[in-house]
């Protein structure tokens, strides 16, 4: 079994729950998790339970959100830290659903793979 398949199997329940709650196809969530977290093996995923590379905004920090500091695009960037992988999946779904940049994605049927 490949690392991608192992990740998908391990986190499928999280992705399916988010699909039912927010309408984001589980396959899309898992694919992004695989890429962003290097199959759950990135430092960000292992240390912060952050599987999607979501950066900590000033409002996240002001609201008491935890964060870790990592060098990514720039040195010493702040990334959200979660108590659990489930919290990471939940925040990812809300991030997509509430961000106007992704609004067009939700105009498509969840099973429309052509767009």
Regions found by a protein language model. Give the residues of each.
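Catalytic cores of secreted/periplasmic lytic hydrolases that degrade extracellular macromolecules
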Residues: 1-115
């Amino acid at each position: 079994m490949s690392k991608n398949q192992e990740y998908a199997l391990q986190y499928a329940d999280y992705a399916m729950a988010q699909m039912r709650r927010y309408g984001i196809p589980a396959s899309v969530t898992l694919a992004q998790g695989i890429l962003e977290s290097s199959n759950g093996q990135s430092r960000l995923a292992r240390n912060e339970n952050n599987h999607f590379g979501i950066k900590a905004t000033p409002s996240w920090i002001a609201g008491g959100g935890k964060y870790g500091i990592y060098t990514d695009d720039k040195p010493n960037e702040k990334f959200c830290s979660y108590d659990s992988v489930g919290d990471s999946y939940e925040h990812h779904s809300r991030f997509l659903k509430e961000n106007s940049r992704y609004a067009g994605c939700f105009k498509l049927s969840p099973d429309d793979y052509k767009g």
